[in-house]
C-alpha cells in the first residue's frame, strides 16, 4: 500500500508494566517485532515508530520522538502523522502484539475517505489505538493537545469517524497488555 503508512506507538511510560512493553517477549520475539511483522507486508519500509528509545532502531524503520512530549498516545499519533508523507495511516499501539496483517488489511479495506478515523469495535468497546487515521486530522489533534484534552476516544468521538465491528475470528487480536498479570496470562 504505497498510499498508506504504518505507525507504531511505542512512546508510553509503561508505568503499570514497570518496563518498556514493546520490548517484552512473546514466543521469543518482542511485542514491537510482532507488530512490525504484521505491518511490513502492507507498507514495506513505509513505517514509522514513535519512541524516544533507541533500542527500537533494530527494526530498521524510521524512529521519531514525540514532537510535543508527555501527551500520551494522542501526542504519539500527532507525531506519527506529522512525519507521515501519506494521506492514510494505520496506527497500532505497541501493547497489541497479537494483531495480524490480515486484520490490518481488512480494517484498511473498510475505511472510507469520508471519515477522518476508522477505529475497531469489539464487544461494544472502541479501540482508537488500532485504527486508520487520515493525516489531515493533525489539525484537530493539535487543538486538543493545546487544550490539554488528551483522551484519544474523546478526540475521535468529536470528528467524522466510523466504528468497524471486528469479526469474531479476530477479536482476540485486540487484547491490550498493560500489566504484569496481563502479560503472564498472554504467555500461557
PLM region descriptions:
Residues 1-149, 157-171, 180-181, 187:
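Nucleotide and nucleotide-moiety/phosphate-recognizing core
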Amino acid at each position: 500500500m504505497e498510499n498508506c503508512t504504518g505507525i507504531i506507538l511505542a512512546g508510553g511510560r509503561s508505568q503499570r508494566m514497570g518496563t518498556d512493553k514493546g520490548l517484552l517477549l512473546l514466543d521469543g520475539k518482542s511485542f514491537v517485532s510482532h507488530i512490525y511483522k504484521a505491518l511490513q507486508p502492507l507498507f514495506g519500509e513505509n513505517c514509522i515508530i514513535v519512541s524516544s528509545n533507541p533500542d527500537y532502531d533494530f527494526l530498521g524503520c524510521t524512529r521519531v520522538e514525540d514532537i510535543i512530549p508527555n501527551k500520551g498516545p494522542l501526542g504519539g499519533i500527532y507525531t506519527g502523522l506529522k512525519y507521515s508523507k501519506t494521506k492514510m495511516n494505520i496506527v497500532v499501539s505497541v501493547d497489541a502484539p497479537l494483531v495480524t496483517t490480515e486484520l490490518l488489511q481488512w480494517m484498511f479495506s473498510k475505511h472510507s475517505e469520508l471519515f477522518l478515523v476508522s477505529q475497531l469495535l469489539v464487544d461494544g468497546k472502541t479501540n482508537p489505538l488500532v485504527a486508520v487515521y487520515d493525516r489531515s486530522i493533525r489539525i484537530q489533534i493539535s487543538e486538543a493537545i493545546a487544550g490539554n484534552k488528551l483522551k484519544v476516544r474523546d478526540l475521535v468521538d468529536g470528528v467524522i469517524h466510523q466504528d468497524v465491528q471486528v469479526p469474531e475470528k479476530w477479536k482476540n487480536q485486540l487484547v491490550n497488555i498493560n500489566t504484569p498479570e496481563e502479560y503472564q496470562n498472554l504467555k500461557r
